[in-house]
Curated annotation (Swiss-Prot):
Function: Functions in the N-end rule pathway of protein degradation where it conjugates Leu, Phe and, less efficiently, Met from aminoacyl-tRNAs to the N-termini of proteins containing an N-terminal arginine or lysine.
Protein name: Leucyl/phenylalanyl-tRNA--protein transferase
Reactions the enzyme catalyzes: N-terminal L-lysyl-[protein] + L-leucyl-tRNA(Leu) = N-terminal L-leucyl-L-lysyl-[protein] + tRNA(Leu) + H(+); N-terminal L-arginyl-[protein] + L-leucyl-tRNA(Leu) = N-terminal L-leucyl-L-arginyl-[protein] + tRNA(Leu) + H(+); L-phenylalanyl-tRNA(Phe) + an N-terminal L-alpha-aminoacyl-[protein] = an N-terminal L-phenylalanyl-L-alpha-aminoacyl-[protein] + tRNA(Phe)
GO terms assigned for molecular function: leucyl-tRNA--protein transferase activity
Single GO cellular component term: cytoplasm
Organism: Pseudomonas aeruginosa (strain UCBPP-PA14)
Keyword Iron belongs to the record: no
E.C. no: 2.3.2.6
Ligase recorded as keyword: no
Compartmental location: Cytoplasm
Gene3D superfamilies assigned to the protein according to its UniProt record, in alphabetical order: Leucyl/phenylalanyl-tRNA-protein transferase, C-terminal domain (3.40.630.70), Leucyl/phenylalanyl-tRNA-protein transferase, N-terminal domain (3.30.70.3550)
Gene Ontology BP term (one): protein catabolic process
Entry keyword set: Acyltransferase, Cytoplasm, Transferase
Length: 226
């Protein structure tokens, strides 16, 4: 039975209460209050819904993650990185990145990054929790991604690309930066061929919860310098 959250109830049900079909649906309702969003990620779930739907909270099993030491860079991508065709920055234009991620795409109907969602994550950015990666070419924003950093974990949310390899260059740069700072896991949420090509793989929800419990409150061991 699906749990419905009130606007005053910040407690999520145990992860093992998530539905099998649709896979990982844990709860519905509530709001996108920053305190609730932080509680959700700390608990192991995230919001994902379309316009016109109630807020839906998910914890899929299995969970797609990337361990920084398992990052895979293909020969063609390595060549692109060596050519330095792009400039990569952190937290220079969070709003532009999330708006670009929310823009309509040819292969999808609508967007799950609704206006309330954008505003909520911009507030998390102002609080130093959400971060953006920008990829520039000739001073134009051509790719990027955003997500949340908690302890030694990074929770990726979405990425976009307007030039070949732009989002991959941004992602690889981020992963290397997080690895140097002592991060142990990057949550990719759901599987895609794009992420698997970079080394992401599936782990069980229980294993993901173990990493969450162990590392969400541990400070990075190196200089994060976002």
């Amino acid at each position: 039975m699906l749990t419905w959250l009130s606007r005053t109830d910040f407690d999520f049900p145990p992860l093992d209460k998530a539905l099998q079909e649709p896979n990982g649906l844990l709860a519905a309702g509530g709001d996108l209050n920053p305190q609730r969003l932080v509680a959700a990620y700390r608990h192991g779930c995230f919001p994902w819904y379309q316009d016109g739907q109630p807020i839906l909270w998910w914890s899929p099993d299995p969970r797609t993650v990337l361990f920084p030491d398992e990052l895979h860079v293909s020969r063609s991508l390595a060549k692109c990185l060596r050519q330095q065709r792009f400039e990569v920055t952190f937290n220079h234009d969070f709003r532009a990145v999330i708006q670009a991620c929310a823009a309509p795409r040819d292969y999808a109907d609508g967007t799950w990054i609704t206006t309330p969602m954008q505003l909520a994550y911009q507030e998390l950015h102002l609080r130093g929790i959400a971060h953006s990666v920008e990829v520039w070419q000739e001073r134009q924003l051509v790719g990027g991604l955003y997500g949340l950093a908690m302890g030694r974990l990074f929770f990726g949310e979405s990425m976009f690309s307007r030039a070949d390899n732009a989002s991959k260059v941004g992602f690889v740069t981020l992963v290397r930066h997080l690895r140097d700072a002592g991060f142990v896991l990057i949550d990719c949420q759901m599987p895609t061929r794009h992420l698997h090509s970079l080394g992401a793989r599936a782990i069980s929800r229980g294993e993901f919860a173990d990493y969450l419990q162990r590392y969400r409150d541990q400070p990075p061991t190196g200089d994060l310098d976002f």
